[in-house]
Amino acid sequence: MPSDKAAYLAAHYLSTDPPNKSSSSTSKKRKRKNKSAEDGLIIADDDDTSWAQAAKRDSDDDDFDGPVLAAGVVSADFRKAKKSGWKTVGSSSAFAKQATTSTTTNSTKEDIDAAAAADAILAQTAAETAALAREAGGDDEVLVVDTTTGATALTRSHQPAETATQAPIMSNGTHAGLQSASAITAQLKARQEAERLELERIRAERDQQHPEDQEELVLRDATGRRIDASMRRAEARRQQAEAERKEAEKKRALKGEVQLEQARRRREELEEAKLMPLARSKDDEQLNAELKQQDRWNDPMAQFLAPEEVKVKGRKKGTAGRRPTYKGPAPPNRYGIKPGYRWDGVDRSNGFEAERFKALNRRERNKGLEYAWQMDE
């Protein structure tokens, strides 16, 4: 009986493929296999032009043509460890335990081999992606899919650190993306400075290669006629000198004749001083002449000198500072003022001065007559 029971258990429960397995267990196992396959590495053929592949491409919302890497995938996910579903029944526990141990050992070896193969595939895929990125110059973007969270992100594929940190530069010299106003201003200034330096370098190289073809400054007037720069500068200097001369004449006109004469004499004295000897004695004729020409208010000999002998720089003392007077006869007036030298001899007064003098003369005459009459009596 025990042998029959052990044979029955081995035939019905210890077989890996039982003959009378229900459809429900088969469907469950198929679902688990499909799930493990979905969680593992997916290798898709980009060159597949079938209708199924086209439908998958059309259903994708993100129009991304780059390579796709799965993040968060380990080799153990490709082949999950299978637990033994065997049960020990009755007295055949030792046999069942031995069978379970052998099955678990076989499944563990298979899992290790599958994990090693998956790791090799992942390493080969990463190496191929890095090689493609290096050949493309490090500018290709790779879509990384995290299988644990389902998130996707675009990353640079194995490019140098200095190029990975730099954002794309637009045509105006600024970086693409959201930036502050100060950053954009600094980028524009840097672009302008770089363009200015480049232009100066190009001009310097051109001048060194062709020094005879240097640019000449051309000036034109409002009508478009060409103006010579040297003639324009000479005209500007002439106009400036003319303006200074007019300003000096205007200041000179504000001064009187006496001040101008004194200034002229002072200039002449300075010019003559260049030729004078350093020591001047009492016998110096020029010094004595200058001292004689000076007028002093307390000079005791001034009253004995004739007016013709007293001269001030070639002009007589009697005529110095006097205005010309009328030389002909003129009617008298009570103040003794003589008419000007331009008077034409016509008396245009109201006759008061003449009547006054007549009254004075009449009074004096009457006074003399009265005195004479008294003597006669």
From Swiss-Prot:
Pfam families: Bud13. The keyword Magnesium does not apply. Residues 185-276 form a coiled coil. One of its GO terms (biological process) is mRNA splicing, via spliceosome. One of its GO terms (cellular component) is U2-type spliceosomal complex. It is found in: Cytoplasm; Nucleus. InterPro entries: Bud13, CWC26_splicing_factor. The keyword Lyase does not apply. Keywords: Coiled coil, Cytoplasm, mRNA processing, mRNA splicing, Nucleus, Spliceosome. Residues 1-47, 203-255, 293-341 are annotated as: Disordered. Belongs to the CWC26 family. Associated with the spliceosome. Involved in pre-mRNA splicing. This is Pre-mRNA-splicing factor cwc-26. The lineage of its organism: Eukaryota, Fungi, Dikarya, Ascomycota, Pezizomycotina.
